[in-house]
Amino acid sequence: CPCALGLATPVAIMVGNGMGAKNGILFKTAVSLEEAGKIEIVALDKTGTITTGEPKVTDVICNKGVTEKELISFAYALEKKSEHPLAKAVLAYAEAAQTDIFEVNNFTALPGNGLSAILGSDKLTGGSMKFISSQTKVSADLNRRAEQLAEQGKTPLLFTRNGKLLGIIAVADVIKEDSPRAVKELQNMGIRVVMLTGDNERTAKAIGAQAGVDDVIAGVLPDGKESVIRALKEQGKVAMVGDGINDAPALTRADIGIAIDTADIVLMKSQLSDVPAAVRLSRATLRNIHENLFWAFFYNIIGIPLAAGVWIPLFGWTLNPMFGAAAMSLSSFCV
């Protein structure tokens, strides 16, 4: 019965979609389910994909004669008026520590460098190692500590009061627990894994090492990811994994877009480990389709001539109508 041929593909796709949905993986189309198993390169956006996307304070290092409470209080006063993403991490840490709250005046933000403000008769400054070291003397010990933090993929923020260094607050976007495992699974499946990030190369390589990604492309701004994906597509079939908002152009440019928000494949659980799961499901579905088609063709190549009596002159084979009806149903059931 040719019904088996008609059922071979749609039944497998329906089952694949159902299994994906059950595990929080939504395939937008049947094509995305089929194509996911063919990808050769997976490009992972760092923020929100490999990392949590929510920077947190990881280290607080005070200068001699300065208490952690003082450092956190003055840092809070400065960062409270900042719009920088890392400021939220400092504010959250300070609020959790129930630090003293001060109000500053004459607040100034210096993009790419740091902050400055007046608190009573004191001048407070905060910012990058490069910026603060140009304003005041940084001891060899704290300079070394700041370098070590940067090598670990963290961002060291230095703070001063009247030109005296108070200490360092390190902020980092923490790696998701399942990221290293997911990267390893993809690599074991023969897929090349690439990390895209806007961070500097040293920080990017440190984060990549934590996640197990050797192929890191640093200094990539959101609007530059599309061109990176275009270049990667010349080397193989590419899947881009990122959020559905900032990475929209890159997700569209890739052969397969996988996102936490909206794309060809949507990850409802926001877990990177669902990426290799989606690839495995796609490959299993394709394998099932091929098996279904093989058995459907094999079954009908033998059965149709038998039902038509073609084999009677050659082998004397005949088919009882009752068995023919049963065989027709069995072919669809097997698929």
Where do the language-model regions lie?
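Extracellular/lumenal ectodomain signal focusing on beta-strand-rich modules
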Residues: 41, 59, 103-106, 215, ...
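Conserved phosphate-coupling serine/threonine residues in phosphotransfer and NTP-handling enzymes
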Residues: 9, 197-199, 331
